[in-house]
From Swiss-Prot:
PANTHER family: GLYCEROL KINASE (PTHR10196:SF69), SUGAR KINASE (PTHR10196). ADP binds at T14, R18, T265, G308, G409, N413. It catalyses: glycerol + ATP = sn-glycerol 3-phosphate + ADP + H(+). This is Glycerol kinase. It comes from Shewanella frigidimarina (strain NCIMB 400). Its EC number is 2.7.1.30.
Length: 498
């Protein structure tokens, strides 16, 4: 019998649906991508059409097999990784969504969260879920749908409606409505899942007034959930994780103290804390991760709102560059920023400050400051913000970081990676394959069906493209970082958080 040697990872993101074929050595064979429509019905509201999510993802799957030049019979399994928190509610008999998906960025359920805060339940929610009471997470979105979509509450009470994050929706569609399932990393972002008991929490369901029957079964992140006939063959759907946890697993940050930073539009930093759910006192979230041999682990998570978006701003709004790749060239033309700090609080500040009212500023301008200094300050700001979160992680976990693994578009910038190493004093490891989010899903699926035997075997497939080690002396590092903290304090009263 010929061994099926390919894994397909479905990477369902906020702006596009992608499918990536990996071979038995975890090399990328082919990629297909389909963008889909963003809907903004009101200020602060963000929606996706669940049927368009499905059509874009299913067509990307069919296309990638053609691009790879492989038969559906060669596919050992399909893994899924997805945008987290985005909420879909549909009728289980017709398969039709009751409304558009409410996207993680959507703030429409703010009033629900404020009402619950006024009831004094914030600490209870935090203790059970590791999350802050915020519209970002799924629970308030589900409640909003049940309270505002005509007939939804009645259908839900009658047991006719199903809820799912995007992973659940994709599996349900792939299996033609046979399987209603999620896994712990996605469940942990709903604000209905007790991360300590690893079960749906009745008290939280009562708090948000959500019927238990709507919720999917929670299975391990590495398991065969069902089979799809979509590509014309009986293919196992066999491994899932939310995008950031999938990237953490794709980087094999499976031991306590290992951390990764994904440099995208924002920056997402996760640190594995092993079997201990560390409660943060420094503005981080506690969430579920995947550890060695796919056991449930915990992680600390911090998000920086403005990462690569700062570079887009330099290009699109200020016109200082014509291409993001130019930033390294201009930053390298000067030895430092000439005392300039750019605090990119365009939509407030994320972890560890959590100040929605902070606004951006360029500080320290003198007559000698020029374009190169401002561009360099923008790149340095991404690294400073990442250090803010890494320092918080070290304080919360009592584990000093010695290295951080990186992925995402901005890691191609050598200046940024070197400055990240310099300002943290931590070794920055850039992998050969930077598609680590999809790779995490592929690893989980491959382990579930026996393509790979263990996480130890996976370690042999990860290769490092380059390591960046600090060349900055301790005094310079301390002086520069103190300047950053002072700059942040000028735009936010929370700036002295460190």
């Amino acid at each position: 019998m010929v061994v099926k040697k390919y894994i397909v990872a479905l990477d369902q993101g906020t702006t596009s649906s992608r499918a990536i074929v990996f071979d038995h050595q975890a090399n990328i064979v082919a990629v297909a991508q389909r963008e889909f429509t963003q809907h903004y019905p009101q200020a602060g509201w963000v929606e996706h059409d669940p049927m368009e999510i499905w059509s874009s993802q299913s067509s990307a799957l069919v296309e990638v097999l053609t691009r790879a030049g492989i038969s559906r019979h060669d596919v050992a399994a399909i893994g899924i990784t997805n945008q987290r928190e985005t909420t879909i509610v549909w009728n289980k008999h017709t398969g039709k969504p009751v409304c558009n998906a409410i996207v993680w960025q959507c703030r429409r359920s703010q009033a629900i969260c404020l009402d619950l805060k006024a009831q004094g339940v914030e600490d209870l929610v935090r203790q059970k879920t590791g999350l802050v009471l915020d519209p970002y997470f799924s629970a308030s979105k589900i409640k909003w749908i049940l309270d505002n979509v005509e007939g939804a509450r009645e259908q839900a009470e009658a047991g006719d409606l199903l809820f799912g994050t995007v992973d659940t929706w994709l599996v349900w569609k792939l299996t033609q409505g046979e399987v209603h399932v999620t896994e712990p990393t996605n469940a942990s972002r709903t604000m209905l899942f007790n991360i300590h008991t690893q079960e749906w929490d009745e008290e939280l369901l009562d708090l948000f007034n959500i019927p238990r029957a709507m919720l999917p079964e929670v299975k391990p992140s590495c398991a065969i959930y069902g089979y799809t006939e979509l590509a014309g063959n009986h293919i196992p759907v066999a491994g899932m994780a939310g995008d950031q946890q999938s990237a953490l697993f794709g980087q094999l940050c499976i031991e306590p103290g290992m951390a990764k930073n994904t440099y995208g539009t924002g920056c997402f930093l996760l640190m594995n804390t092993g079997d201990k759910a560390v409660e943060s006192t420094h503005g981080l979230l506690t969430t579920i991760a995947i550890g060695a041999d796919t056991k449930v682990n915990y992680a600390l998570e911090g998000s920086v709102f403005m990462g690569g978006a700062v570079i887009q701003w330099l290009r699109d709004e200020l016109g200082l560059i014509t291409d993001a790749c130019d930033t390294q060239y201009f930053a390298d033309k000067v030895d430092d920023t000439n005392g300039v700090y750019l605090v990119p609080a365009f939509v407030g500040l994320g972890a560890p400050y959590w100040d929605a009212d902070a606004r951006g500023a360029i500080i320290g301008l003198t007559r000698g400051a020029n374009r190169n200094h401002i561009i360099r300050a923008a790149l340095e700001a991404i690294a400073y913000q990442s250090r803010d979160v890494l320092d918080a992680m070290s304080k919360d976990s009592n584990v000093p970081l010695t290295q951080i693994r990186v992925d995402g578009g901005a890691v191609a910038n050598d200046f940024l990676m070197q400055f990240q190493a310099d300002i943290t004093g931590v070794t920055v490891i850039r992998p050969q394959v930077t598609e680590t989010t999809a790779m995490g899903a592929a690893f989980l699926a491959g382990l579930a069906v026996g393509v790979w035997k263990s996480t130890d075997e996976l370690k042999t497939m990860l290769s490092t493209e380059r390591e960046f080690t600090s060349t900055m002396d301790i005094t310079t590092r301390a002086t520069l970082y103190k300047g950053w903290q002072k700059a942040v304090s000028q735009v936010s009263p929370n700036g002295d958080v460190g």
